[in-house]
């Protein structure tokens, strides 16, 4: 039976885009797993198989993420992009790695908007193969985007607030008034605190 899976990569970083991806297939006859549980090399190998399936994705830049956080919420932005992906789905049944604390609420919203059978589950990227496949697409594409940014701006680490290398990069950029507007999420508390500390 044809099913689709949707997942995102890069929800939490203070630097770089978020990627939402969807994969649709009748069956997945090769190994997949939650992208977070795989090494980079293993993800890349599986990506070659997964990318041969029907898939769609969106790369969402930091400015759009900031705008959503200011006006509504990050969840609201993900709802919008999940809806766009579902409307492009080749199948009637779509599994989503739930980004809302309330699974049934998100299911209801997306069912009402799309008319599709939407099933939202926490840890779906780990438990449902088609969502694992989507998580690999999203993660590898985001990793590729991060490498492109590093080739322009230098090595800023993982981009996550918990990464000391990322924090050093941000602090150095703020002190030196470097133009990193295109890559940083200014609405993140991490960035705001660093800016405040150097006013």
Swiss-Prot record:
Question: Which is one Pfam family of this protein?
Answer: RNase_HII
Cofactor binding note: Manganese or magnesium. Binds 1 divalent metal ion per monomer in the absence of substrate. May bind a second metal ion after substrate binding.
- CDD domains per the UniProt record, alphabetical: RNase_HII_archaea_like
Under Enzyme Commission nomenclature, its number is 3.1.26.4
Return one Gene Ontology term, BP aspect: mismatch repair
User: Enzyme class, one word?
Assistant: hydrolase
Q: Where is the RNase H type-2 domain?
A: 1-199
Record key words, sorted: Cytoplasm, Endonuclease, Hydrolase, Manganese, Metal-binding, Nuclease
Record's GO cellular component terms: cytoplasm; ribonuclease H2 complex
* Primary location recorded for the protein, binned into one broad class: cytoplasm
Swiss-Prot/TrEMBL catalytic activity: Endonucleolytic cleavage to 5'-phosphomonoester
**Is the Transmembrane keyword given for this protein?**
no
Example of a GO MF term: RNA binding
Q: Which cofactors does it use?
A: Mn(2+); Mg(2+)
Instruction: Provide the protein's localization.
Output: Cytoplasm
Residues involved in a divalent metal cation binding: 7-8, 97
- What's this chain's function? Endonuclease that specifically degrades the RNA of RNA-DNA hybrids.
Looking up PANTHER family in the UniProt record yields: RIBONUCLEASE (PTHR10954:SF23), RIBONUCLEASE H2 SUBUNIT A (PTHR10954)
Q: Which family does this protein fall into?
A: Belongs to the RNase HII family.
Protein name per Swiss-Prot or TrEMBL: Ribonuclease HII
Originating organism: Picrophilus torridus (strain ATCC 700027 / DSM 9790 / JCM 10055 / NBRC 100828 / KAW 2/3)
What does UniProt list as this organism's lineage? Archaea, Methanobacteriati, Thermoplasmatota, Thermoplasmata, Thermoplasmatales
